[in-house]
């Protein structure tokens, strides 16, 4: 399944700390006809999933529980097995994969019907609506896939992610909780209902 969304407010949030030349290059790359493409992957797309997931673990290891060392050791069958209980979305811009997440259908905390995880957007494309486009895809397919009420966990120190989730309709649910995978760290549940 492929769904395209026009890139709205594409110049908002352009790499706040980048040089004027880097900003200009990014603006030129994201010409007026740019669109974000959201793909629902199949097991045959395992290599595409592996590539973006390992990029995410290298770029932002602090955002995830699993490590690059753990996941880089998975073979093809290990990656394919992930599709047995989870759906994977990838957001692409100009044929470059720039964002990802997974959705697991379950009856979770706070009345959720599914759990979102592994959310990541390439830092060069944050603020361009990649994550928002993936959640719009979720909204369009929420009834048929059982994705009506989404839940997720976010590290409490990751205020940028918390603000991004709030901007697309998530709200805090419950109290912060201690992590079992990262002693001394805390995470917060957030929930959102599809529109």
In which residue ranges do the predicted regions lie?
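Conserved N-terminal entry element of GNAT/NAT acetyltransferase domains
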Residues: 7-44, 51, 55, 193-195
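Conserved Rossmann-like nucleotide-binding pocket used by diverse enzymes
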Residues: 37, 115-117, 150
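Acetyl-CoA-dependent GNAT
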Residues: 43-51, 55-124, 135-137, 141, ...
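Conserved glycine-rich acetyl-CoA-binding loop
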Residues: 109, 118, 122-136, 143-145, ...
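C-terminal "cap" of GNAT-fold acetyltransferases
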Residues: 148, 155-162, 167-168, 174-195
């Amino acid at each position: 399944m492929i769904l395209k969304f026009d890139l709205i407010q594409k110049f908002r949030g352009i790499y706040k700390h980048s040089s004027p030349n880097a900003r200009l290059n990014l603006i030129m790359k994201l010409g007026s006809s740019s669109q974000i493409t959201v793909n629902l992957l199949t097991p045959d797309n395992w290599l595409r999933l592996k590539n973006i997931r390992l990029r995410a673990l290298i770029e932002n290891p602090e955002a995830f529980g699993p490590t690059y060392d753990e996941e880089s050791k998975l073979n093809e069958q290990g990656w394919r097995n992930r599709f047995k209980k989870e759906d994977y979305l990838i957001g692409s811009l100009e044929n470059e994969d720039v964002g990802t997440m997974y959705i697991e259908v379950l009856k979770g905390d706070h009345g959720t019907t599914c759990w979102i995880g592994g959310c990541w957007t390439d830092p060069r494309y944050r603020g361009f609506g990649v994550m928002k486009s993936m959640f719009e895809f979720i909204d369009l397919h929420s009834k048929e896939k059982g994705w009506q009420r989404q839940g997720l966990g976010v590290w409490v120190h990751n205020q940028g992610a918390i603000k991004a989730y709030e901007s697309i309709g998530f709200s805090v649910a419950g109290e912060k909780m201690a992590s079992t995978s990262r002693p001394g760290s805390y995470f917060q549940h957030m929930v959102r209902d599809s529109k």
